[in-house]
């Protein structure tokens, strides 16, 4: 079997290919945000590709091109913003709806968008995101100093990630925490300004490659992800894999998260108390969930079954 992987999101496609059997032939069609790369260049690469299954990340132009070029069987993999935001756009919405109807199978990466996908496809399925355990694995914590080392690891985005909630909460315990933040996201400048106005000092870290993110996780005592969606992001999964407890808003309304130990941490007060209490005991519970639901080989095995059924 030959798998043609098209585009990617948070290295999910790359990780899936990496852990597939050597007996499976693999091709990964990637693109940049350049005009040629994401239009005519992309269409040409898809046209020339020959495979037994085509797996496309995001239900946007990549998926639309593959469908129009007759690539079958076609697996469309939604990653959140395509269903939360693009679906409601006057132009992109038509493309997303076309893809939802034309793909042989639709997958979603988080439970919070599954109900949206099922408005168009009753057979849409949640596939947990895999974690590359060769890159992200536990290391012992360094001895904790007077302050707890907190890393805000997700991109600064107030509407989607709730970064402002994290800043306001941390400012109320600023004498007990040493806060670092990675310099990226549409609201990074606003986030830095808010922290400054509240007297919260931030250690600003440069954005690094995916392969080096583990160093940031290992340097923290607690990792903060997002508070706006109610679902687990890759930041949380990778940080837990690195041996660090994660503070994130996971909604109790999603049965897929029944075994995750933190639920409904979505207010400043809850964020504060969870950061204070976050320790090795919390991490062990989170890590148990991770190994049960996101173990890479199990996710790949499940995906290959979907491929075989779709062929």
Question: For the regions a protein language model found, what residue spans apply to each?
Answer:
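Active-site proximal beta-strand in glycosyltransferases
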Residues: 53, 68-85, 107
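Conserved donor-binding/catalytic core segment of Leloir-type glycosyltransferases
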Residues: 140-161, 167-174, 179-180
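Short hydrophobic beta-strand element within catalytic cores of glycosyltransferases
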Residues: 241, 245-248
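A charged, aromatic-enriched C-terminal amphipathic alpha-helix characteristic of glycosyltransferases
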Residues: 11, 269, 279-308
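Short His-centered aromatic/hydrophobic patch
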Residues: 56-62, 78
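Aromatic "clamp/platform" in nucleotide-sugar-dependent glycosyltransferases that forms part
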Residues: 227-228
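Donor nucleotide-sugar binding/catalytic pocket of nucleotide-sugar-dependent glycosyltransferases
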Residues: 101-139, 145
